[in-house]
């Protein structure tokens, strides 16, 4: 089944307020790359009618652009969040690369995430039966991404978009955690009280 056909079925299933603009339009993700906060972004359009190819290409391009600028956000984290764009039917999906590649903002105009706290806990999912045909849909993506970023000293933030939809911001510090912080964490783990 093509991504376009799947999205049409998902839209019917959820009875979305605003359908895709045209049956002829391929789903699109726009990648906005900022060299500095004062510059206009370079915009790259990633289109495709195959879900895995579109997600893979978007995640790979985002990762490459981030790394070229010195970013440290892991590929797997980027891919998990880009894959979640299926919940928004890829509606106005935008990936923004900021802060020398160390901040990546993924936004959409989908239905949004009502309970952001539970969305970051394993096992909570809004994936429909149709979505689970091509994604895991078990509520593991956001929690895994959050844990991986925390391990690197980074954060995952979920916010409402301006009118509707969601904005997920992935960020890590420009410099990796120093060696001085690692022994303290190890020492804390040795004192387990049950």
Label each PLM-derived region with a short phrase.
Residues 1-38, 77-78, 83-194:
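Conserved beta-strand-loop-beta-strand hairpin that lines the nucleotide-binding pocket
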Residues 36, 40-46:
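Generic detection of short hydrophobic beta-strand segments and adjacent strand-loop junctions
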Residues 42, 57, 61, 65, ...:
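General secondary-structure edge motif
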Residues 45-81:
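Conserved short strand/loop->alpha-helix "switch" segment adjacent to the catalytic nucleotide/phosphoryl-transfer site
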């Amino acid at each position: 089944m093509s991504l376009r056909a799947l999205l049409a079925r998902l839209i019917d299933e959820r009875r979305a307020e605003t359908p895709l603009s045209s049956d002829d339009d391929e789903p699109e993700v726009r990648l906005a790359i900022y060299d500095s906060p004062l510059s206009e972004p370079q915009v790259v359009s990633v289109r495709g009618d195959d879900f895995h190819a579109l997600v893979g290409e978007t995640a790979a391009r985002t990762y490459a652009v981030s790394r070229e600028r010195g970013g440290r956000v892991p590929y797997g984290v980027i891919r998990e969040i880009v894959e979640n764009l299926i919940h928004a039917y890829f509606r106005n999906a935008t990936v923004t690369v900021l802060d020398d590649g160390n901040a990546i903002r993924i936004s959409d105009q989908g239905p949004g995430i009502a309970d952001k706290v539970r969305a970051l806990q394993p096992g909570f999912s809004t994936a429909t039966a149709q979505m689970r045909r091509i994604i895991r849909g078990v509520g593991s993506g956001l929690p895994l991404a959050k844990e991986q970023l925390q391990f690197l000293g980074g954060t995952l933030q979920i916010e409402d978009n301006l009118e509707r939809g969601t904005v997920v911001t992935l960020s890590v510090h420009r410099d990796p955690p120093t060696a001085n912080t690692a022994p303290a964490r190890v020492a804390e783990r040795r004192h387990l009280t049950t």
